[in-house]
Each structure stands twice: as structure tokens, then as C-alpha cells.
Amino acid sequence: MSAVMTTIRVFDTTLRDGEQMPGVSLPLEYKIRIAKQLDKLGVDVIEAGFPSATKGEFESVKEISSLSLNAEICGLARIVKEDIDAAINANVDMVHIFVPTSRIQIEHTVKMSKEEIIEKSVECVEYIKSHGVKCMFSAMDATRTEVEYLKQIFKAVENAKVDIVNVPDTVGVATPFKFYELIKQLREHLKVPIDVHCHNDFGLAVANTYAAVMAGANEVQVTVNGIGERAGNADLAQVVMILHAIEGIKTNIKTEHLFETSKLVERLTGVKMPPNHPIVGENAFSHESGIHAHGVLKEYSTFEPGVVTPEMVGHKRRIVIGKHAGRYQIKKILEEAGYHLDDEKLNQIFEKVKEMGDKGKRVTDLDLFAIAEVVIGELKREEKAILVDEVTVLTGNKITPTAVLNAEVFGHRKVTSAIGVGPVDASLKAVTSLVGESIRITEFRMDAITGGSDALAEVYVTVEDDEGHSFTSRGAAQDIVMASIDAVINAVNYLLRMKRRKS
């Protein structure tokens, strides 16, 4: 095995390659928020964009460069003087130049011979270095490039004083064993640091990145949530936690910020992560099966990796109710919410949960509490903290979406209003403002459960208070605004009732 680096640098390309994901286009405000979050996370390099691509791209890279972040700011450029000048004029710390090196890429994308490519690459490296700026050189499509030519061009730019070379698996065709051998050969041939950039076309981006580190790579290119061209890139959280938790290899990443970073990028890009996404997915530390949940409640490492905990990545462990749930986990969840039951009532609740699950229904926290209250005879309208009598929503192409709610809150009449980016957002903000406590919506999901323009909408929301208590609730109606309001109010009511039970 090659000498593995004790500390690996993290090069994040969410704002460049990540934004190249179809359907993703980030305004400057969002790019700045993501850049600041990446800096908080501790990435070593932020590739802020491709400055020569558009005027807006140039301005965004320049703006991010002016933020005085701890991370180095990098701009992408072809081996073209105009591209390089644009990056330098955007005040980046590093210019990342690239050129095709595989036979298929050379034949179809550049009008130069192999020798001319080397000559031009060296010229560009020297030009960048003469301006006092760092330089990264990428041999595009490296994994389909003849190894000897790859060694030749990398050695040439190394002699020109390039700061780091990048080995990109541009079309995701590398496999871990082959990529390990390639990086090992290059590591033995070069003195300059090696960086890798892996695409996920065959689902191997993370594995290939890991293999490269074990072969002696110094730096890894990643994106938050693995977003990027086609099937995406190596996922930041997965790569970092494999290195940290499994191999004991250090990075400068503050892992407790991984989950919040994932959620921010998910929200700003509009790219929803699947719940089973490793490390940062909603279900990454969730347990429904009775056997698993029972074990985790006794000792978390029975059915979790153990070397990584939700706290390490800023996540939370969840015990979820469903048809696979066991009596023990149902009892624990109810006890934590202030419900104390004898065995007979617990068995009744257990059977009703199983019955709902067998009918294909998702059993939310509030479903469980409602079942419990029916069984023990406590479900009363007057116990609800919020009773909404009237909802008025205004929206339009020239009207700021506004919601007005007339409600009874803890027995007192209250009228409140809020504005939002849309009618649902405005309505949910109005609901949360009804309660004089810190309550926020951490998850919102909507599905159409019938067809047609008058489809029945089903909304799931998760609300959380400042003490970390959270509940998931559902609402259903033909009006998506009302479905959303119902779901949030149900969750808030039970959150407040749970607090009263515990007080």
C-alpha cells in the first residue's frame, strides 16, 4: 500500500460542478450563503465558479473572493488566456486550469496535438504563477487517458511549478481497484500534491475517492450531497466520514456541521435528498423495525456503525413508528411524550399501529398519540391549544403572498398575519407566529394522492421547538394551503400538550 497522507485537504466544488446539475441555477445571494456555510464547515478550497462563462459568473466569483473567508477561493479556466485572465481578475487564490487528455476528447473537443497540449499547458501554468496566484492543473478524462501520456503531461506542469495536479474521472468509468493503481503510479512518479475528482455515473464516486486517498492522494474534490453533472460527484459527507470514522484520517472539516450544510444546500438548490442518503439523509439514523429499535434503545451501536453517531454529524437519532415497530419502542416513545400506560392499553395501541401499517398508511408521531388518547379516553377538542376559525390568503403575480389567520389560542381570540414566498409559506409562518414560543418547521413534504386538478393533497410536516422536541404530522385536503395549515396546527397542538403533560 502507498503512503497514506495523515491529513487530507477537502476541495469543494458545489458552486461550480454542483451547479452544473440539470435544473440547478443559484443566484448570487444563494452562492454567498453556501460559500459562508462551506467556510464554517472547514473546507480547504471553495471552487466558486467558472469566471469566464458569463458576466454574472465572474461577478459571483469576485464577490465570494472578497468575503475574506478562511478557505482558498478557486476559479475554473480552460488553457485559454482570456479564461485565465478572468479568473485572476476575479481575485481568486487559485486558478484551476483543465485540458482534455484522452484520445476521444482530443479528437473531438480540441484542435491540438498531444505535444501542443503539453506545451500550451506549461505556458498557462507559468503565466498563472507569474501573477502570484496558485495553479491547479487537471488532465480532463484522465481515467481514459494513456497512463504514460498522463505521466508526461503531469511531469511537465510539475516542472513548471504547478501547485497541485488533479486526476479527474470525468465520465465516472473508474473502478476502485483500477483507480487505486493509477493514483499509486502517479504518486510514485510525481512530487507535486495529487487531487482527485470522481463522478458517480456507476455509483462509485465515493469508493473511487476513498481508493485514491489510500493510494496516496493529498486532496479530494467533493460536493455537498453529491450533486453535479449527470449522476453527480463524490459526496462530501460520505467521503469525510469514511476517512474520519473508519480510517482515522484527519481533515479540517468540522463534522458537526455536516447535516446543517446538507439541508442548506438541499433547500437552496431545490434538489431533495432521498431519505436513505448516507450520513445526512433523514433516515440515516432512523429505526422502525422492533428488533433494531429495541437494540438501539439499549445500546446504539447494536444497529448503527458505532464509529459514527448522529451527534458527530449534527444529525438526530429517530425511533420511527410503523407496522414493523415493537411494543418496547412504542412504550418508550409514549413515555417520553408523557403517556404512561398499563400492558393492556399498550397492547391495544400496538395492535392499532399494526393495523394502520398493514393498510399501507404511514404512522406519524401524532397518529400514535391520537391512538393513545383514544385508548385512554383523553381526546378532547377543548384540549387543543390552537383552534383556527378563519383563513384568508392573498396571492398573485403582483401581490406579495399574505396569509391572515383568525384563531383561538389558549382560549383567547387572536388574529395574525404573515407574508412569504408563496401562499403556503405565508400560511405556515402565520401559524407559527400564533404561538409565543420558538417553533420552527424542519421538514415539509407534499404529495397528490388522487389525480386531476382537484387532487387531494397530503402534507407531512415536522415541527421542532427550542428544546429539540419534534413531531411529524399530516394534513389532507383538496386545498394545499389548508392541508398544510392542518398539518402544522396538529403538530403544534401535540407539542404543547406534551409540554403540559411533562410539567
UniProtKB/Swiss-Prot annotation:
Domain Pyruvate carboxyltransferase: 8-259
Binding site for a divalent metal cation: 17, 197, 199, 233
Keywords: Amino-acid biosynthesis, Branched-chain amino acid biosynthesis, Leucine biosynthesis, Metal-binding, Transferase
InterPro entries referenced in this protein's UniProt entry, alphabetically: 2-IPM_HCS-like, 2-isopropylmalate_synth_dimer, AIPM/Hcit_synth_CS, Aldolase_TIM, LEU1_arch, LeuA/HCS_post-cat, LeuA_allosteric_dom_sf, PYR_CT
Enzyme class: transferase
Catalytic activity: 3-methyl-2-oxobutanoate + acetyl-CoA + H2O = (2S)-2-isopropylmalate + CoA + H(+)
Gene3D superfamilies: 1.10.238.260, 3.30.160.270, Aldolase class I (3.20.20.70)
Annotated CDD domains: DRE_TIM_IPMS
Transferase in keyword set: yes
Cofactor(s) essential for the protein: a divalent metal cation
One biological process term in Gene Ontology: coenzyme B biosynthetic process
Coiled coil ranges: none
EC number in record: 2.3.3.13
Pathway, per record: Amino-acid biosynthesis; L-leucine biosynthesis; L-leucine from 3-methyl-2-oxobutanoate: step 1/4
Recorded GO MF terms: 2-isopropylmalate synthase activity; metal ion binding
Role, per record: Catalyzes the condensation of the acetyl group of acetyl-CoA with 3-methyl-2-oxobutanoate (2-oxoisovalerate) to form 3-carboxy-3-hydroxy-4-methylpentanoate (2-isopropylmalate).
Family classification: Belongs to the alpha-IPM synthase/homocitrate synthase family.
Record text on subunit structure and interactions: Homodimer.
Listed name of the protein: Probable 2-isopropylmalate synthase
